[in-house]
Amino acid sequence: MFAVIKTGGKQYKVAEGDTIVIERLAAAAGETVTFDSVLMVGAGAGVTVGAPMVAGATVTGEVAAEVRGPKLITRKKRQRQTYRRTIGHRQDLMEVTITSINTDGKAPAKKAAAKKEEAPKADTAPKAAAAPTEEAAAGGDNLKKITGIGPALEKKLNAAGITTFAQIAALSADDIAKLEEELSLAGRFAKDGWVEQAAELAKEA
């Protein structure tokens, strides 16, 4: 038996035991996921085509691993200007092993991921370091001098450990992509030229 499912805007033809790589869903490794968008189901010579979905059909799989796709490099350039930008991106993906194809309208119970055993905490264990406070960040640079960085964004950068112009100027493409994802900056480093501004301000500091 095979089925054609739709997830993440793409279609996949699957059978029991197949492992597919899809865009990451809200599930951890070891958990069970159910795909309700089944476009076609086939068994032997019989094929059922949905309109657009096959009523009562579901496909169940187990999350094998969470992975990341290959790095995609985007380069931007403007003619007759010294404008060069390089941005890297890696898509969050997951490997799913198909465990069953159901056509009776009943999906198997979801399997939760096994919980990791936590080591006993000692009473004398040191407390985790708190996020940098304004006093801790006082020894750094005034990041608000960079165009596009205001007080709120400066606090977010300080909390991420970025307190000086030199740190921003030394960020690699991977570091920038990670920061933009964590702080929801969506290409602000390249758009506003923060690395170049930080490099100039670091020289003046």
From Swiss-Prot:
Comp. bias (Low complexity): 122-137
Q: What keywords are annotated for this sequence in UniProt?
A: Ribonucleoprotein, Ribosomal protein, RNA-binding, rRNA-binding
Could you tell me which residues belong to the region Disordered? 107-137
GO BP terms in the entry: translation
Gene Ontology terms, MF aspect? rRNA binding; structural constituent of ribosome
Recorded GO CC terms: cytoplasm; ribonucleoprotein complex; ribosome
Q: Does Ribonucleoprotein appear among the keywords? A: yes
One Pfam family from the UniProt entry?
Answer: HHH_5
Keyword RNA-binding applies:
yes
Hey, which family's this protein in? Answer: Belongs to the bacterial ribosomal protein bL21 family.
Assembly notes? Part of the 50S ribosomal subunit. Contacts protein L20.
Tell me the function of this protein: This protein binds to 23S rRNA in the presence of protein L20.
Protein name in UniProt: Large ribosomal subunit protein bL21
> Which organism was this protein described from?
Hyphomonas neptunium (strain ATCC 15444)
